[in-house]
Amino acid sequence: MSEENQEKQFAIQKVYTRNVSFEAPNSPEIFTQDFQPQLDVDLNVESRSLEGGVFHVVVRVTATTKMDDKTAFLCEVEQAGIFTLMGFDEGETNYLLGVQCPNTLFPYAREAVSDLVTRGGFPQLLLEPVNFEGIYADHLQKQAESTKQ
């Protein structure tokens, strides 16, 4: 059966936490100060093919909070998933890997970050929702511009 005639299938096989790290290097002294944090969040999405239509996608969230020049905490979560994508052309597959899969994984990563930060003794941290569609569109635009040069 050719790819054009194959029925499209998008399925989640597994969602799991691949890596978790939480550090509060300046505790307990940091807890005695007025908490005026400066938050920096880094987000990264990686994907790779495992075998015939099966892909592994990882959303990595790193949240670093500083007070003045001291790190209050550093939290990193890698939320991963295994997805089946069958019958899609290359553009559709790239879209699913860059938008739909991260949209599926991010709420789990967001919850894990919030839980780790709270368990670390800090006020709850609720990460803002991420517009993976916009990030993907920006990525495509930058790719198109770099090929023109």
Curated annotation (Swiss-Prot):
Single GO biological process annotation from the record: protein folding
InterPro entries, A to Z: SecB (IPR003708), SecB-like_sf (IPR035958)
Keywords: Chaperone, Cytoplasm, Protein transport, Translocation, Transport
Entry GO CC: cytoplasm
Gene Ontology MF annotations: unfolded protein binding
Gene3D superfamilies per record: SecB-like
Subcellular location: Cytoplasm
Family statement: Belongs to the SecB family.
Subunit record text: Homotetramer, a dimer of dimers. One homotetramer interacts with 1 SecA dimer.
Described purpose of this protein according to its UniProt entry: One of the proteins required for the normal export of preproteins out of the cell cytoplasm. It is a molecular chaperone that binds to a subset of precursor proteins, maintaining them in a translocation-competent state. It also specifically binds to its receptor SecA.
Listed PANTHER family: PROTEIN-EXPORT PROTEIN SECB, PTHR36918
Protein name as it appears in the record: Protein-export protein SecB
